[in-house]
Amino acid sequence: MKNIEIEGKKISFEVKSKDVRYVYLKLKPDFSLQVTVPRNRDVDINKILEKKRPWLEKKVREISQKIKIFDKNTVLYRGERFEIKTYYVKNPEKRIRLYKKVAFVYEDSNKKKEEILMEFLERETMKYVKERVEEFKNELNVTYASISTKNMKKWGYCTKDGKISFNWRLICLPERIADYIIFHELLHLRHFNHSKQFRSEMEKYFVDSKEIKKTLKRYYS
């Protein structure tokens, strides 16, 4: 891989030839750059990267402000970052314990750290969602068909027949943002769109809606 320095960061990039008409650039969260060029066509990559430098600088700044939900060493829980410490224990009584910003994970031959964390977060998300849904549905006077958690890119989704799904990582977010997402999906039971009336009701309950949406875009897994 070749490298280019943008905003003080070393960006590694690879070039792929595909059946496309134009050159495409994609900067990933790990600051690796994918350059796609038309097949069988001579392209001056360095010239293109210099031309796109202002765009790349903007993207690097945006990614630098993003908040990673969890990685090998840390995990977010209710908006707080916990250091992960893993121990191998035969037949552990508890799989995970949170104490003073540390997540103690007890794995064995049957379950590893990643699976334990995922199950814990999914369980905590469902518990939190159920509590908040019961409160918000009475506030909105709506009924739903079912509530579930899924592994998906969106934070939440509501179908026309009242089935609501939430991202199992929801519990990682600050409570104010998680509540916004839950309320947002429940409100779709009253307005199945993002009409002016829908937005007006959201802002009635969440006067900081614009700031919440802006902050939410910073979180990624």
Regions found by a protein language model. Name each.
Residues 185:
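Walker B catalytic acidic pair
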Residues 182:
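Walker B beta-strand of ABC/ABC-like P-loop ATPase nucleotide-binding domains
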Residues 1-179, 189-221:
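Active-site-proximal or metal-binding-adjacent scaffold patches in catalytic folds
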